Amino acid sequence: MTPIVFIDRDGTLIEEPPDFQIDAYEKLRLVNGVIPALLKLRDAGYHFVIVTNQDGLGSPTYPQASFDGPNALMLQIFSSQGIVFRDVLIDRSWPADNAPTRKPGIGLMVAYLQDRDIDWARSAMVGDRPTDLQFAENLNIRGFQLRTPQFGGDWDWDGIAHTLADAPRRAVVQRHTKETNIRVEIDLDGAPQARITTGLPFFNHMLEQIAKHAGISLQISAVGDLHIDEHHTIEDTGLALGQAVRQALGDKRGIGRYGFDPPQLPWQVSGAAAHGGFTLPMDETQASAVLDFSGRPYFVFEGTFVRERVGDMPTELVPHFFRSLCDASGMNLHLSVHGDNDHHKVEACFKALARALRQALQRHGHVLPSTKGAL
């Protein structure tokens, strides 16, 4: 789905003159900061639509020809910098006409309201007047009023671009079945912290490792049918956590995508004992994780456990948890472990995954890390 920034023209993209009509080339002035802000939003996946009231356009007091030349030059300037507008919607009525197509009315928006490919949750309206904020409210999207001497306002273009393009990646998932009731809250950019309650203390401890070593904020509350066994609680927690990660990532623009062990790190093992991926030791144990947020879930596990359970967590459910996590998050994960102590082996698996996640989740600009155009 595509987010759209709906943008007023006069006073928002271009400076508004005292007579409120840009009907001559010499009146054309771009608003400060608009081009770098729109480039940042474009790179974050936003499309742009101009929505403007032009009082009496086409009348003797505002001839169409006087409007067309400066408007075409404005669009050409933006286009020369890589900024293209998906549409230009113009209402030509007078305020006294009270037309439904005139902002803050949304009569010009019928086609967009019927478009199911628009990400309305991330879309926004930017303008310089209170009527632009009312327009945003009527569309049920966020509104930003640019700071101007004429109409006030609290925002500049740099702040708007930062707020929309660098928005925190958060998600809340509630999974309720006849077997479990699970709530996951995740903030991929929050301070590393964890509040975990699953009814399984060792499993809690492992999930805390993900939050700590991935560098994310994670809250999980799971109530399951532990009187039967642990399977449903562990499996459904993996599914809910995976769904939360997927939702928080959004369209995945700017992420590292891959989690692996950079070869220059001093703790990477070489030679016959080397394992591909993010490799870490825990005493006699060594675990490796390599992952890809490709959107194609796949899980490969290499390792064995001797004990039936570690604490209150059955060891057969360790790979099952990771498989559930992959299925719901759209992640491809290869995980391997070898050692002597099953406690160390389980914990090293969770820590290796977490460190690979840290790398894959980091943002580096706003470019989508795929040649296909979607992940």
Swiss-Prot record:
Primary location group: cytoplasm
Family membership: In the N-terminal section; belongs to the histidinol-phosphatase family.
Active-site residue list: D8 (nucleophile), D10 (proton donor)
Region annotation Imidazoleglycerol-phosphate dehydratase: where it falls in the sequence: 169-375
A GO MF term: metal ion binding
SUPFAM superfamilies: HAD-like, Ribosomal protein S5 domain 2-like
Cofactor(s) essential for the protein: Mg(2+)
CDD domains documented for this protein: HAD_HisB-N, IGPD
Species: Xylella fastidiosa (strain M12)
Segments of this protein annotated with the region Histidinol-phosphatase: 1-168
The keyword Magnesium appears for this protein: yes
Keywords, comma-separated and alphabetical: Amino-acid biosynthesis, Cytoplasm, Histidine biosynthesis, Hydrolase, Lyase, Magnesium, Metal-binding, Multifunctional enzyme
Stated name of the protein: Histidine biosynthesis bifunctional protein HisB
GO CC terms, sorted: cytoplasm
EC numbers on record: 3.1.3.15, 4.2.1.19
Pathway: Amino-acid biosynthesis; L-histidine biosynthesis; L-histidine from 5-phospho-alpha-D-ribose 1-diphosphate: step 6/9; Amino-acid biosynthesis; L-histidine biosynthesis; L-histidine from 5-phospho-alpha-D-ribose 1-diphosphate: step 8/9
